[in-house]
Amino acid sequence: KVLSCMAANIKDVFVGTAPDASYWLLRSEDQDTEQPIEEDYWAAAIEFADSVGIDVVNTSLGYHAFDEGYPAYRYRDLDGHYSLMSHSASLAADKGIVVVCSAGKSGRGAWKKVTPPGDSENVLTIGALTKDLVNAEFSSIGDTSDGRIKPDVMAIGVNSVVSGNDGRVSKANGTSFASPTMCGIVACFWQACPWLTAKEVIKAVQQAGDRVDFPDNIYGYGVPNLWKAYQTEVEKRK
């Protein structure tokens, strides 16, 4: 379902945000457990992604609490570097990869905050919106422990159109769907502006948000207009 948000191309029914892109599917999540070693798996996946020349990564997962016996992250740990995933995501940006990740679904819970790697400065963290462009109650919020705005931008994550392995189109809720929706759009934007670095892409997406003049820790910089971002970047080149 996550992949379909980007890659689906069902004529006259459902087209994802980057249907002509090429994809690698890398699994790091152990569905039977929730242990810190899964962050190592994720870091290994990012290393592999770099080795095969991947440009943009979507990750619709994050970690806050683990199985009994393992300590959970604390708010003070959300500094963009403390967790292995956040550190690895920053290294990926240094290597030229744009990492797009889901903010998380803790908005209704006691934790509320974005989950690593979403606290990384050099990651585009995506919150979920309703069709009316209102923040979804479940969507995790910021800020980070060092005072940075999170999430970065927003995308539809309530009643998102998705397609399963059987090809049937349905609807689903979650920042896990907001993230790939935005990821595909970001990939198209970068294709149109190939002279930008990964970090410049992130900055351009933030600056294209409809709340760029008044960002907060619920909506971030808002909904980005990447056509406007494209025009801005082309104008800079003149």
Question: Would you name each region that the model predicts?
Answer:
Residues D79-G96:
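Catalytic-core regions built around general acid/base machinery
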